[in-house]
Amino acid sequence: FMMAIGEFKVVKDTYKKPDGTLMEVNYYVEPEWEGDAKAIFGETPAMIAYFSKLLGVEYPWDKYHQIVVRDYVSGAMENTGAVIFGDYVYKNKRELLDENDQSTIAHELFHHWFGDLVTAESWSNLTLNESFANYSQYLWDEYRYGKDEAAYQAEIVEKNYYESAKAKGYHNLVWFDYETREDMFDAHSYNKGGRILHMLRSYLGDEAFFKGIQLYLTKNQFKAAEFHQLRLAFEEVCGEDLNWFFNQWYLGSAHPILDIKQKINASTNTIEITLEQSQNLELAPIFKLPMHVAIYDSLGKHIYPIVFDKINQSFTFPFNGGVNCVIVDDQQMLL
């Protein structure tokens, strides 16, 4: 429940639903920001349309308002149909050329499916809310600005997880032995969880990934869910046992660290790539890592799928002429 009282100007916008009806999308701002409100929040109707189509579940509420308040300590909050933002979002049109808050706007909107429509059944499962909201930022960047910009922003998200984990320690994504619920609001639940979803998307492919999400949302709407419900939805769609993925990423800690060596055999026109998992095995498991290796030779680029699931493993690939470049995890699947 949220109540906002103040001298707001209400800047009105709309979202056109698939049936042609219009839904209110209003922006509540202080009077001096009335002229900038649509510049700040104006992508919101397009976000609602895109996310509704992508998820296969129409925005499930009857309005979407965004209210800017002062002295708010939590950045923003996904109150159903009435999201609040701190006054940091106030930027004029010139300032918005340098920095906008579309990632936060997308994040809070996505919570209306993940958090509001389907709610994590416990603080331990908070990542079911926050990882999806975090990943929405990638999805919007990918749609609005292209894959390169999305990948660039994803690198920042991933780096923030590494730095946070190094400073504060590692824990499971689904974390049962936290001390206080505030401990759950960290770069594991948000950043790491978002990148794990991207790994799963890369592994399953877009069709199965988004159908799995649609099934998860429709089966669990207006209910509380835990991460096993998410796994079961993906398994039903793809027909594959995904316990290995969820066990290592949701119930396991830390992340893989890979050492890579290569050896070219000119007499057989082959290259041997040796991979080693060098993470601390007291903190992390030996990961099963599906990925792709790209070999660039005189005839162009050749992509080979592999599964690396041992401490040390070698893979041999053919080449033509000479090897110009080798890229392990060519599709940037891995955390």
Q: Could you describe each region identified by the protein language model?
A:
Residues L242-N243, S253-V328:
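Beta-strand-rich binding/interaction modules
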Residues F1-A106, Y135-Y138:
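Hydrophobic helix-coil surface modules that form long, contiguous segments used
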Residues D98, E130-R195, M199, N220-F222:
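Acidic/His/Gly-enriched intrinsically disordered linker/tail segments
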Residues V29-A39, S122-W123, D183-D186, M199, ...:
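Second-shell loop/turn segments in exported
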Residues D330-L335:
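Short acidic/polar inter-strand loop motif in beta-rich domains
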Residues L109-S124:
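Catalytic Zn2+-binding segment of zinc metalloproteases
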Residues Y178-E182, D186-I273:
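Amphipathic alpha-helical substructures
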Residues D19-E24, A82, A106-H112, E163-F176:
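Active-site-adjacent bridging/hinge elements
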